[in-house]
Amino acid sequence: MAENAYSKAGVDVEAGYQVVERIKKHVARTERLGAMGALGSFGGMFDLSSLHLKEPVLVSGTDGVGTKLLLAIEADKHDTIGIDCVAMCVNDILAQGAEPLFFLDYIATGKTDPVKMEQIVKGVADGCEQAGAALIGGETAEMPDMYGAEDYDLAGFTVGAVEKQKLITEGAVKEGDTLIGIPSSGIHSNGYSLVRKIFFKDNELTLDAEISELDVPLVEELLKPTRIYVKPVLEVLKEVDVHGITHVTGGGFVENLPRMLTNDLAVKVELGSWPVLPIFDVMKKYGQLSELEMYEIFNMGIGMVLAVAKADVERTLEVLVQNGEAAYVIGEVTTRENDAVIFTGGTKG
């Protein structure tokens, strides 16, 4: 009777059970050393002693995907948005030097569609595999009074660990350090309220619009998953004393690069030192945005920036290339006079 009453209230308990069965195989492939317990336990568990750290510091992060979700819903493509969710969380804690250990997801929806939920969690599991993190728990909440039947929201939470003496904080970056940029895949997961306004409101384009500068339909470009930098950057951290790491997210270069600096330092960014992806030129044109506005909002083709001593530049680039990364020397750290971010040179690409 209780289930029948719950169903009358709009909550499909049976669909929830189907989701659990469907996602088991995806969760299983994220298993890693230290992960404990089984899917369905009240709490996810992790054995910290398995890491053999002398002074472990736990680093946590939580994030969502923002209005990029609206594009996934409109396009009915749900198998990569979970990668975005994982990326936004694990890249953030990587900036402190932490190795992601585990991840939990939260999905809220108006109506539980087991096939759709499986696709979302598949993406989350794909992201966890890329990050080396175990998917140890999550929640799917059906709330018909809060969401439309096709709507959902997705958020995640991750915890990582790092030796206390290897923790990266803003005080380590020094004047004269070199900035090394690692490419993004595209827009990643920030600025989509503006992106959607530019393309679909102001210019009235369709999801499948073909734009000459892009090699795929517009929606395919906009749904490219956020890159996960964990494995190549962890390899760099084994070899090099990295002074600072920035995950270039909302606020672009202007807001994020200063986050690894003390107040007396600034960064000089050499425009033209890396190829700007075509999607950014397209947005600048269609949105009639200035060059500075673009760098204040978007990653402009660089998703993560490392600050290292000049003596370590060559080795850093070598390790990144060995791990399949293109990487660019994009600037340097200098004494601050006015602005924390100074752009020099011209654009490229």
From Swiss-Prot:
The keyword Aminoacyl-tRNA synthetase does not apply. HAMAP family: AIRS (MF_00741). Keywords: ATP-binding, Cytoplasm, Ligase, Nucleotide-binding, Purine biosynthesis. The lineage of its organism: Bacteria, Bacillati, Bacillota, Bacilli, Bacillales. This is Phosphoribosylformylglycinamidine cyclo-ligase. One of its GO terms (cellular component) is cytosol. Transmembrane segments: none annotated. Gene3D superfamilies: PurM-like C-terminal domain, PurM-like, N-terminal domain. One of its GO terms (biological process) is 'de novo' IMP biosynthetic process. It comes from Listeria monocytogenes serotype 4b (strain CLIP80459). Its main location: cytoplasm.
